[in-house]
């Protein structure tokens, strides 16, 4: 009743494709290339020597052996220094080089994965990109997209929004973007039958502001944008089972404080706590969990 009717819809989407303004991508490619060259020179000047920026081993040697920056963590095999995003983000607070390296990596990925790659995927006959939408691959039942992944075109930063400008409607049409408002939390409120969450949604309240008031125990008049932002991270973190460790990293706070946020959340939203515990208990017994539409997912060894 859900998957079968969707097959025709997805087939039409794949056949239709989406129009691309290649001139936008070509201009972006040139712009990004120039900035990458400038970043490269900045990085070499900050390092005091030239090296392979794309080599984690050489980057680690510069940061930790030469510049003596504090080691955050080793690689998985414990054979060298980790220079992943988490490490560079922390180091960027103490030195300019890690920040420039992050910028270089981000821009390089945008250029290679999106700007340059998309140009090669335009169908010569239709002038459009025809992605594949995969209906039965993900364990959760969500759609995935490939060749290219049109569900993962960046949007959060300015460069990502510029890439999206290359996607254009055919003549006489417009592109419409629609999104459910806080759909995960609304479903959570419904399934958990949590009175506080339900009341907040029915009253048209800002759910993140409400959570900030409930979890951080502040009066609405003293609520700041920063507290609301933290409450948003807590709200969505709870939905996806985020640990105190992960929340601490997300908000740049101590693990103890992150745990207190989670504990306060469950104290205020007791219905959510009961719902999560019940789902885990039932899943352990029968080895599967179902959505409100009856779609089942097998989960062993929970």
What function would you assign to each model-found segment?
Residues 161, 185-186, 190, 209-210, ...:
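Feature representing long, continuous alpha-helical segments
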Residues 5-8, 186, 234, 297:
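Active-site phosphate/pyrophosphate-handling residues
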Residues 47-50, 281, 293-302:
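Short, intrinsically disordered, charge-balanced linker/junction segments flanking boundaries
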Residues 135-220:
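Function-dense linear segments that define catalytic or interfacial modules
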Residues 209, 220-249, 253-262:
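Structured DNA-binding interfaces in DNA transaction proteins
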Residues 1-2, 181, 202, 223-230:
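Structural motif
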Residues 1-156, 168, 174, 181-184, ...:
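Conserved "right-hand" nucleotidyltransferase catalytic core of DNA-directed polymerases
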Residues 201-202, 211, 217, 275-296:
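Long, charged amphipathic helices and adjacent flexible linkers at domain junctions
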